[in-house]
Amino acid sequence: MTLAKPGSGAEFRLNNKANLKSRLVRDLSHAAGQEPEGSESLDPAMVAAVETLLRGIGEDPQREGLKKTPERVVAALKFLTSGYRQSLEDLINGAIFDEGHDEMVLLRDITLFSLCEHHLLPFIGKAHVAYIPRQKVVGLSKIARIVEMYSRRLQVQERLTRQIAEALMTMLDPYGVGVVIEATHMCMVMRGVQKPGSWTVTSSMVGVFQEDPRTREEFLSLIRHPSNL
C-alpha cells in the first residue's frame, strides 16, 4: 500500500490540537484582514447585512474600530466559502494517471476547517482519506484539495465526509473509498453545552471498505498508528 502524510502524521495529542487551532487562527486572520479588492467585488447587500447585525447587538458600525468591519467580514466569508466557486473537474484538471496500482493509497492527517451551517461557527480537525485504485491513481495533492473544496462551504461534518468519498468514487471509479474525519466544533465549545475537548468522528466507507472487514480494519489501524517521523 501507499501511505502519505501531508503533515506531522501524529495523532490527536494536545500539541496537535494546539497546532490545528493556530492554523485556523492564521487562516481566519488572513481572510478577515484582507482589504476588499474594490467595492465592485463585494455585494453591497451583504455589507449592509453585516452593518445591520452589528446594530442588532448594540454596536455602532461607524465607530473607529468597526468602520471597515462589514467589508472585512464579507471578504472573509467569500474566502471561507470559496468552495462554492470551484468544481471537481477544474480542480482535478486531468491529474489522473494509469499506474496499474491496486493497493491501498492513504493520505492521512489532512488539516481542515469549515463553517457549521447551523451557527456559522468553525469546526476544525483532520481528514484521513484512502482508496483502492482500479489501476488509476490521482495526484496526492488533489485529494487534499478535494477536502479543502468541500470544507470551504457551509457544512455539517457528516455530509462533508460523504461528499469527499463520493467525489473520489466519481473521479476514479476505484474498488472502494474510506474517509474518516475527526473534528472539534466551536458551536459545542463556545455556546450551547460548552464542552471544550470534545471531538466528533464521522466515517464514510464505500465499496470494499464497506464490504470487506479486513480492508476496513487495515484502514482504521493505519490512521490510528502514530508516525515515527
Curated annotation (Swiss-Prot):
Domain of life the protein comes from: Bacteria
Catalytic activity: GTP + H2O = 7,8-dihydroneopterin 3'-triphosphate + formate + H(+)
One cellular component term from this protein's GO annotations in UniProt: cytoplasm
Keyword Nucleotide-binding among UniProt keywords: yes
Quaternary assembly: Toroid-shaped homodecamer, composed of two pentamers of five dimers.
InterPro entries assigned: GTP-CH-I_C/QueF, GTP-CH-I_N, GTP_CycHdrlase_I, GTP_CycHdrlase_I_CS, GTP_CycHdrlase_I_dom
GO molecular function: GTP binding; GTP cyclohydrolase I activity; zinc ion binding
NCBIfam families on file: folE, PRK09347.1-2, PRK09347.1-3
Keywords assigned by UniProt, alphabetized: GTP-binding, Hydrolase, Metal-binding, Nucleotide-binding, One-carbon metabolism, Zinc
Annotated residues for binding of Zn(2+): C116, H119, C187
Xref: CDD domains: GTP_cyclohydro1 (cd00642)
Family label: Belongs to the GTP cyclohydrolase I family.
Protein's UniProt name: GTP cyclohydrolase 1
Protein source organism: Synechococcus sp. (strain JA-3-3Ab)
GO biological process entries: one-carbon metabolic process; tetrahydrobiopterin biosynthetic process; tetrahydrofolate biosynthetic process
EC number: 3.5.4.16
Pathway(s) where this gene product acts: Cofactor biosynthesis; 7,8-dihydroneopterin triphosphate biosynthesis; 7,8-dihydroneopterin triphosphate from GTP: step 1/1
